[in-house]
Amino acid sequence: MTDYVAAGAADLPPGSSACRTVAGRALIVARAQDGTYHAVANRCSHAALPLDGGRVRGSSIVCPHHGARFDLKSGRVLGPPAHEGIVAYPTRERDGVVEVWLL
């Protein structure tokens, strides 16, 4: 795995997200309400629409198009209409930046 800088930690207050392209992959980099950082694929599994603009609620993200909800840590589906999860990537905060690990 290789780690990439995905965002500045100060740019993501709790409950926020940002769309980023990292190593050619469209990602949502988010900070959950508890302050933890996460990265998931920027594609809802329900209708293949972007998650960009979705609300961060607790430790989940809600698709802005149809309301599907996904766990930010695991990518697991938490609410319909999606039935499949999304890809979640390991992240860490180090020296003021959010890093994401990609294969």
Task: Indicate residue ranges for each PLM-predicted region.
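Short cysteine clusters
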Residues: 44, 63-66
